[in-house]
Amino acid sequence: IGVSGGVDSGVVSTLCAMTGLKVLALEMPIRQQKDQASRALEHIEFLKNKFPNVEGFSVDLNEPFEALYNTFDVKDDEFPAEKLAFANTRSRLRMLTLYYYGQINGLLVCGTGNKVEDFGIGFYTKYGDGGVDVSPIADLYKTEVYALARALDLPESIKNAIPTDGLWDVDR
């Protein structure tokens, strides 16, 4: 599972850990805001300390992202479609990473999309964060995800994290 430091991944990773099955939690920064990365790493450490079935670490994807960026010769001041296409590349690079580690460890990739964002308005990247094997909170509204976060006693920093797609260099 990819851990972003947000409430959706916080809830899903905690629920996965509670199953007792092997869980691999990955933080995958790509030009990430420092507070997002630190929340994600703190949550992974929390899971590893509380659940013996959890392993986790950070996979820095900045270098492969920059290589793609330079290969495609993206112009930041040009076409909006080009910017969006490359923003979605972040999600696809993370998906590739999750499936790599999933396959070498014999694990499924678990999604963090909720009912409204992923399955209501389609706020996900095709073949990116939408490309998963299981989606435990796919039927939950965001309000229900927040209720679960409270019930699971997740840290305030995760419960209060500003939702972001993690695809841009700024919070949005």
Regions found by a protein language model. Give the residues of each.
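ATP-dependent adenylation/nucleotidyltransferase module used to activate substrates
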Residues: 1-123
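Catalytic subdomain that performs nucleotidyl-dependent activation
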Residues: 86, 108-172
